[in-house]
């Protein structure tokens, strides 16, 4: 059985597919850049656009398309010459836990994992539709891949209505019930440690380069109402940290929870184990992130 924490510690580049709803918020943009600026740890095979639906989109399909365009924009800011394949993902969520939603992204995930001579790490930071669809289309990829997903809240949290998970509950059920080795980065109760502020972002990034200026403006705009003492969790970077800086994540191996139809956790100690991240070391992770961004 693959010892994921030990594999992650190895100082070699990992083959990575990044699945992102890049236009949903502002944290995906930081994460795409962080991955591209960490070539000693990350070899990006592809970036896939995930669906989302909130005030920044009119439908899951619109959210996916906006994310696709935002991915291209960020890749261009980091390195205009970068040759990273980018794929459109699902236009809707899974109808149930048995039927995939086929897309260019899901097909690319299947192909890239099957073609690889090494373990492929799928880092998913949005609704899990593309990855769940790939697993339904080709269950064999679970033997050659590891999934790192930022989704769900901490196991002790009073509810599990977390954005990424709650959008596609059948998709979450697919991945938690599958055989793919899984690392879960919970949101509330764990990622809430990874917080920053506009003054901190401006201090380290403002004026450094076009990418940094874009990230500063994104962060400022997210507090459009000018709320005092405002802070922002840059959630998604913690998922890429599993590949880039695993020393900043406290991981434990426990039985996988069951995802109920109401998105709650249920427990069966006989279930396959997975890796659960229970703590983020905020300061060294931000130090690494800011250093790489300002040197872009």
Which residues make up each language-model segment?
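Structural alpha-beta junctions
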Residues: 78-82, 180-181
């Amino acid at each position: 059985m693959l010892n994921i924490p030990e594999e992650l510690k190895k100082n070699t580049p990992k083959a990575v597919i990044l699945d992102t709803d890049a236009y949903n918020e502002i944290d995906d943009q930081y994460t795409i850049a962080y991955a591209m600026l960490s070539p000693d740890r990350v070899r990006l095979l592809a970036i896939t656009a995930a669906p989302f639906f909130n005030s920044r989109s009119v439908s899951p399909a619109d959210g996916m398309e906006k994310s696709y365009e935002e991915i291209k924009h960020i890749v261009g800011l980091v390195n205009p010459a970068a040759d990273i394949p980018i794929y459109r993902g699902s236009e809707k969520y899974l109808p149930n836990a048995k039927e995939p939603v086929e897309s260019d992204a899901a097909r690319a995930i299947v192909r890239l994992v099957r073609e690889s001579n090494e373990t492929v790490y799928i880092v998913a930071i949005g609704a899990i539709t593309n990855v769940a669809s790939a697993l339904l289309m080709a269950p064999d990829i679970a033997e050659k891949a590891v999934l790192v997903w930022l989704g769900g809240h901490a196991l002790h949290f009073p509810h599990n209505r977390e954005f990424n998970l709650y959008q596609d509950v059948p998709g979450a059920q697919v991945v938690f019930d599958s055989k793919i080795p899984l690392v879960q980065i919970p949101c509330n109760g764990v990622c809430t440690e990874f917080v920053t502020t506009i003054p901190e972002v401006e201090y380290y990034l403002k004026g450094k380069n076009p990418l940094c200026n874009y990230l500063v403006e994104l962060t400022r705009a997210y507090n459009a109402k000018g709320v005092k003492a405002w802070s922002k969790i840059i959630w998604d970077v913690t998922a890429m940290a599993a590949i880039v800086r695993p020393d900043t994540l406290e991981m434990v191996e426990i039985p996988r929870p069951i995802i109920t139809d109401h998105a709650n956790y249920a427990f069966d100690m006989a279930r396959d184990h997975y890796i659960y991240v229970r703590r983020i070391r905020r300061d060294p992770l931000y130090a690494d992130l800011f250093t790489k961004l300002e040197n872009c």
